[in-house]
């Protein structure tokens, strides 16, 4: 999981958790159910256009609003490989890592346009726009958070740690 490559979908600033997954769908916590409606309020056709491995590149404060783990669950289940933005709401930031959804803070994220392909290299701390050939350095992810991503989230991480202890 050292490199993530995918097609970019752009969304603006202040995309809140109600836009990521609308409250009307929260009667279920089934990831596959939630995936069918991800980002529907921003683009009703988005769930149909999305392909596994695609990457969301958004404006600042992505994931603001209500504290709900349904938002990163829906994104991950829909096949979103990563989210890149200049900043994230702190509770979304933590929920994303807890659910195993990779997110990256990149101040220049708005330079990356929809439809372009990017590669995110965790080892080098770089995002390369394969379309324009421009490379950006992203704000490093702390080692523990990298472990959460590598194991698929906090629950899987805890299970692995418990197995080690036995």
Swiss-Prot record:
Q: Which InterPro entries match?
A: Aconitase/3IPM_dehydase_swvl (IPR015928), AconitaseA/IPMdHydase_ssu_swvl (IPR000573), IPMI_Swivel (IPR033940), LeuD (IPR050075), LeuD_type2/HacB/DmdB (IPR011827)
Q: Can you tell me which family this protein belongs to?
A: Belongs to the LeuD family. LeuD type 2 subfamily.
Q: What does this protein do?
A: Catalyzes the isomerization between 2-isopropylmalate and 3-isopropylmalate, via the formation of 2-isopropylmaleate.
Quote the catalytic activity from the record.
(2R,3S)-3-isopropylmalate = (2S)-2-isopropylmalate
- Which Gene3D superfamilies does the annotation name? Aconitase, domain 4
One GO biological process this protein is involved in is: L-leucine biosynthetic process
| Disulfide bridge map | none
According to its UniProt record, this protein's enzyme class is: lyase
User: Which terms are listed as keywords in the entry?
Assistant: Amino-acid biosynthesis, Branched-chain amino acid biosynthesis, Leucine biosynthesis, Lyase
* Pfam families attached to this UniProt entry: Aconitase_C (PF00694)
Pathway membership: Amino-acid biosynthesis; L-leucine biosynthesis; L-leucine from 3-methyl-2-oxobutanoate: step 2/4
- Which protein are we looking at? 3-isopropylmalate dehydratase small subunit
Naturally occurring in which organism (per UniProt): Aliarcobacter butzleri (strain RM4018)
GO terms of molecular function: 3-isopropylmalate dehydratase activity
**Amino-acid biosynthesis found in the keyword field:** yes
């Amino acid at each position: 999981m050292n490199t993530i490559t995918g097609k970019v979908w752009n969304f603006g600033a202040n995309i809140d958790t109600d836009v990521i997954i609308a409250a009307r769908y929260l009667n279920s916590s089934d990831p596959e159910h939630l995936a069918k409606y991800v980002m529907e309020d921003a683009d009703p056709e988005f769930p149909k256009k999305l392909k596994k491995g695609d990457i969301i590149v958004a404006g600042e404060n992505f994931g603001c609003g209500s504290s709900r783990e349904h938002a990163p669950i829906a994104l991950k289940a829909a096949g979103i490989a990563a989210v890149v933005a200049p900043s994230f709401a702190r509770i979304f930031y933590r929920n994303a890592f807890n659910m195993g959804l990779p997110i990256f803070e990149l101040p220049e994220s708005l330079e990356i346009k929809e439809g372009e392909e990017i590669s995110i290299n965790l080892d080098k701390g770089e995002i390369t726009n394969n379309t324009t050939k421009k490379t950006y350095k992203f704000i490093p992810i702390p080692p523990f958070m990298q472990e959460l991503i590598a194991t698929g989230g906090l629950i899987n991480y805890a299970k692995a740690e418990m197995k080690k202890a036995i």
